[in-house]
Amino acid sequence: MVLENLVIPFQINNIIKGTIVRLSSVASQIINNEYPQNVNSIFADSISITASIGSRMKNDGVFSFQAHSEGIIKTIFVDLNNNSSIRGYISVNNFENIENLPFEKLISNGTLALNIKEGKFAKNYQGLVEIKGKSIK
């Protein structure tokens, strides 16, 4: 039996920490297959990142991943709450003839915001970084 959806944190000798993420049916429900594979791949990576980081929250709360750019992909939003409910949204400006465009053309001049809101009375945390390179990972 192969599990379709799982998030498993692991640690090896207090040196290496990581998370194994597999979201087959969950990602399929979120991703709209009308977009080309390169766009869906970026969206799937965003969903996996959200599941990996958000699954480590200890209290009631929400972890959100927000990417904004001036490229073809305008917005990616994914959030995960403490009940392991995940949802996502992607906004693509024009998805005609973009199948072979590289990451840098799909997301250009981009910003990534990672937000943690834990509980009603806890302080909210936000990290902002410029999106550079050839991948959202």
Model feature map: region roles:
Residues 2-118:
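N-terminal functional module of multi-domain proteins
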Residues 124-128:
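Short helix/strand-capping turn motifs
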Residues 131:
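Active-site environment of non-heme Fe oxygenases that use a 2-His-1-carboxylate facial triad
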Residues 134:
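Conserved active-site/ligand-binding neighborhood in enzyme cores
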Residues 137:
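Cys/His-clustered metal-coordination modules, chiefly Zn-binding fingers
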